[in-house]
Amino acid sequence: MDLLYTTVRKGNANTFSFTETQHNFEFLCNTSSCNVLAFTTTNELTEPSPIQGWGFHIYVVDLNAPWFPYRVTSNKYPISVLQWDVLGRYLLVGDRNGHVQIFVQKDNLLSEWKSVYSVKFPGENIIAAAFFHNGRKLNLQTDKKDQYLYLEKFQKVKFAASVRQFGGVPVEGVLIVSATGMLGAFVIPPESNANIQKLSEPIKLVPVTESLAVTRNYYTTADICYGKNGYFRVAVGNGDSKSANSNMIQCFRVAVKQREETLEINSTALPSFFLAEGMGKDLKELRVAHVQWVFSEDADSLIVASNHTGGGCFVEQWELTEESTPIHKLFQSNKNEPFKTLLWVSKSQYMYTSKVIKICTTKLNFLSSSFVYLAMSDNSIHCLQRDTLKRLTCTNIVSIRDPNDHSSKQIKLGLKIGAIDVTHLGHLFVTLDTFGQLYVYRCNFMCQDQLGTPALIVQTVNLLEYCLVTGLDSLDILLTLKTQILENVLERLTENFHRQPPNVQQYYYVNFLTMKIALYRLSISGQQKAHDLSNLLILHSILIAFKSLLRPSDLTSHDKGPAENLAMVLSESVPDVDKVLLNVEAKEFTMERPTLQSLQQLIQWVADLALNILAKLPESRSFMSNKSQGYDISKDIIALNSIRELLVMIRIWGLLNPQCLPVFSRSADNLDILGTLFRLLTKLSLNPNEPDDLLLDECCLLPNQVLIPQLQYVPSRTMIASPLLPHVTLPVMCDYGVENESLKFCPEVPIVEGGLSNDNVIDSVMYLQLGRRPPSLRRCTRCGSCSSVVSVAKTAAMKAWEQRWIDKCRCNGFWRLEVA
């Protein structure tokens, strides 16, 4: 385990003398599938002293920008449960007074949160919660990991949804367990995100309750996992020293059904066991501290962490097995088959001299590197192998600062580990201390060192493809990727994608481009390739948006639409755009004038892209070898033909409404820039790898005929997944509220001869100029792109375009509010 970075609060040496560990408050942290960490603190992170701003606060932070924490809420009672849904959209918060709230991002900003649903279980201490399973599960087949087809490599697992309504549609909802042995469940209304954003106050939902056991009992720890048949499995324990059942673990099977407009909960007892029956029977006064299912889906194994009076801990793995039990022949219904029963069997154990504070496990069960993590009272972190509980590594959060640092940055002895968690893909391990400070470790190098380079490339590509297919965020893979295999990973990822069937390629095309952009941005030399791929992604989105506006003039023609007819005409490579217009049906491209006017900024971007490709062509062919690796948009025939299709549409629309045409600063008024661009792109598309000298000469003259606008470049970005990360000393020391300057990367902007530069901030969604210093904007936490907070879309076409990026940036990053 390598410490990647730490994020600490600003302060001086005197303010850290207050110790929070004397209070019996539980600290929690949970990582979503989008690699956003939610965590609790008892002080505001913006205050220099832990004593100031005392309360029960919840913060979220993007693991790629850990210096910007955003407060979700401040609670009146201690927080006892913190849980994300599978998509990372809902954040569930439960407290010791029985109040459960569900938060979502306000206005789709990571920096703003609002409570949308509220449920009350008066007086109940919520100790566990789980969202209903949606029945969708995809596994990587380890025996087919060398296959290139996604449909063979990734198999859908037969898994039933937790609650289903009419037609088998999964229901969204939550199951909770309280300390008094109460089960509670409620349904989340199927509201759209737009309707949720309009709520001024949270909707109060009505829950259904039931007893977990026949009689209500007191429990101190609980965990919930999903069964493949749609039920839940609940494991509970009571670590109270005054209880007679302090070393007993009880398990239940819970089924939640929807009956008309209400829910019905049924709880059935499963075999239970005592810790004295296991390998720790010789230890005195074992008290259950934590129970944890090995996996959250269809688990038969349970990790039980206990503390004993000697000051140490005992961790044991129990497995539910089916064993034959001998019975008298008079009681056998079938004499040919033995009578079988379910029993818990102790499989492995681990002992340590300090008490265990927290426990967590890796979340995916098909990974070869599946671990159990333990946080101890002596601030040590232990990583155990899942099956044998053999210790693989051990580290400590104390003394990680440089001894030459200022005293305000030194770790104080009063710090204790508060909570731990691991990301969904298991590559990053997060530790939260009692002052709300973060310690993020890279933990996949333990298995990387054991693999050869070819096997490591295959494993990395498989995980990236799993993210591509499932939609999981791949940030933790990017942060642990070795730079020396980056090119090989990109090559294999691209090769595998192009070997997929056409329908599969079309379905995952945007996800594939987004992933390649993120990979190229990890290296300093890959910035231009990432920029070209970003332009390709925008070009593809504009082409799809424009094609969706076309309507066939003859409704009886179902074979081909206007877009297909246009592509067929362009396949003949006619260089004159006006001759192309003679072969297309103009009525199929007819639209309202206001709609055409609203598309002007997107039309302008297409024209600017065409100008930049052609203006850079002579320089790129003279300084770069044709065998150079990586992506180059000027060599992409599909991209060039997409621009040609758009130029034909723009030409037709310009005849309907000249105000929608792109604006050029040309040397002579009689120059037909659109016609020239189409002609040159047609020539280039015939042989993009080796354009003839005549074409290069014409491209050299292009900056003399028209000013070339500079395409949008993010001037600088500061993030953990920076190209500078391999060149800085680890761990990276970060402070809350201050960007780390050592990771600030300013990409080299290629200057086009005769180009027109612009210092204004450009909206990355609407492609409007926002000025040099706009008062407020939303900025992406991953790529640094900016967009206006205020919607300017007036027509249905532009509103649909804006909705494409309303939730996230085109790089799949989160928007955050930035105020000047």
Curated annotation (Swiss-Prot):
GO biological process, one term: positive regulation of DNA-templated transcription
WD repeats: 74-114, 621-665, 757-811
Keyword Nucleus: yes
SUPFAM superfamilies, sorted: WD40 repeat-like
A cellular component term, taken from the record's GO annotations: mediator complex
One Pfam entry name: Med16_N
Keyword terms of this UniProt record: Activator, Nucleus, Repeat, Transcription, Transcription regulation, WD repeat
Localization in the cell: Nucleus
Similarity remark: Belongs to the Mediator complex subunit 16 family.
PANTHER family from the UniProt entry: MEDIATOR OF RNA POLYMERASE II TRANSCRIPTION SUBUNIT 16, THYROID HORMONE RECEPTOR-ASSOCIATED PROTEIN-RELATED
Protein's job: Component of the Mediator complex, a coactivator involved in the regulated transcription of nearly all RNA polymerase II-dependent genes. Mediator functions as a bridge to convey information from gene-specific regulatory proteins to the basal RNA polymerase II transcription machinery. Mediator is recruited to promoters by direct interactions with regulatory proteins and serves as a scaffold for the assembly of a functional preinitiation complex with RNA polymerase II and the general transcription factors.
Subunit structure: Component of the Mediator complex.
Record's protein name: Mediator of RNA polymerase II transcription subunit 16
Taxon lineage: Eukaryota, Metazoa, Ecdysozoa, Arthropoda, Hexapoda
Gene that specifies this protein: MED16
